[in-house]
Amino acid sequence: MSTKPEKPIWMSQEDYDRQYGSITGDESSTVSKKDSKVTANAPGDGNGSLPVLQSSSILTSKVSDLPIEAESGFKIQKRRHERYDQEERLRKQRAQKLREEQLKRHEIEMTANRSINVDQIVREHYNERTIIANRAKRNLSPIIKLRNFNNAIKYMLIDKYTKPGDVVLELGCGKGGDLRKYGAAGISQFIGIDISNASIQEAHKRYRSMRNLDYQVVLITGDCFGESLGVAVEPFPDCRFPCDIVSTQFCLHYAFETEEKARRALLNVAKSLKIGGHFFGTIPDSEFIRYKLNKFPKEVEKPSWGNSIYKVTFENNSYQKNDYEFTSPYGQMYTYWLEDAIDNVPEYVVPFETLRSLADEYGLELVSQMPFNKFFVQEIPKWIERFSPKMREGLQRSDGRYGVEGDEKEAASYFYTMFAFRKVKQYIEPESVKPN
């Protein structure tokens, strides 16, 4: 039996053969997408999508083939997109100028041997994003399909590990975008903590506007990774600790600025969870990042890649110079840009084996870890009928399958991975190393 790992969908066959040796026999057989036919009974294409019945004919119709009324609708929609694009260009120009000024200041600070205050950058960024967000224009966003895909992933994660009556702690809860998802799971209490006060205020507004949420919600402004959670939650006696669930969605990478912060994050998780409780979340896939970095020669000073949707830029080539290995599992900073969402914010690589090792120290056992595309293909058959018609429409690609396509595929399906741990033992904090 072959001991080779499964080839990630984002890795070319040539690169896989180079790294693990060539394959022969049945392992080497492939099917050309051009020649293969999709049937309604096929389980999926392995690309983070699921085939469906022939329902894409309407989606692929040309404007010229449609009735006059429909053609007029397309023109109106096009004008709305043009107005939105113009407003977005102006907004992004202002935001980019501000971000460049901030990064320039931080570069000067680094030159003076002072550390970057990434927490402040992140706080300012998400405060700004909250202020400029206009939910009425959400459906016109150029990354609406990516947002739908990420929401589907979170629905699946929450449903897989959350039980009715659970108490949930979400670290980095943002504007409360998952409140309705947890309502569907039937939880009894939601505790959300975020470093951005503007995001917490927006989460309060969102919660007050929602109906039929029959669970208690506690929303708190606080630093989830830089200090003990006790500092943030002490003024809120209604919080019911320990929790059944701790969740971190698209934010744990900020904790990997230093080993101290990463350990504080895992300690906060471990101290907040019951034995048997689950810690799950979503993070950038360190193996995909390595794969991309490995393609750059040592002479390239600032490795960078991306497309029209996202861009990743490392500030130096220390990875390449260190024989294509990170010099440390912590502090491996890059800036991340995502169209209509994130404006060149500093983030940190989360080497998954480091996360797994830390989690083990704090009594957390790995249950599952999968790239988004693989997790989506595994879970979507259970969700096709559960999702609302609007959600299904939002997930449908131009070929009739479900998932993401084009540039959005790499930005979501390939760049991110899910994980889940279970607390199996109580962590005893040594007296001599207890943080203040």
Curated annotation (Swiss-Prot):
Record GO cellular component, one term: nucleus
Consequence when changing E287A: Still viable; normal growth
Cell compartments where the protein resides: Nucleus
InterPro entries reported for this sequence: mRNA_G-N7_MeTrfase_dom, mRNA_G-N7_MeTrfase_euk, RG7MT1, SAM-dependent_MTases_sf
Effect of substituting V349A: Still viable; normal growth
Catalytic activity field: a 5'-end (5'-triphosphoguanosine)-ribonucleoside in mRNA + S-adenosyl-L-methionine = a 5'-end (N(7)-methyl 5'-triphosphoguanosine)-ribonucleoside in mRNA + S-adenosyl-L-homocysteine
Reported impact of D194A: Lethal; no enzyme activity
Impact reported for E170Q: Non-viable; reduced enzyme activity to 8% of wild-type
Alphabetical GO biological process terms: 7-methylguanosine mRNA capping
Residue span of region Disordered: 1-50
Residues at which S-adenosyl-L-methionine binds: K154, G172, D194, D223, Q249, Y254
Marked site: mRNA cap binding: K175, K181, R206, H253, E347, Y416
Resulting phenotype, G174A: Non viable; no growth
Gene Ontology MF term list: mRNA 5'-cap (guanine-N7-)-methyltransferase activity; RNA binding
PROSITE patterns on file: RNA_CAP0_MT (PS51562)
Binding site for mRNA: N150, N151
Domain mRNA cap 0 methyltransferase intervals: 141-424
Effect of E170A: Non-viable; reduced enzyme activity to 8% of wild-type
Recorded family membership: Belongs to the class I-like SAM-binding methyltransferase superfamily. mRNA cap 0 methyltransferase family.
Protein name per Swiss-Prot or TrEMBL: mRNA cap guanine-N(7) methyltransferase
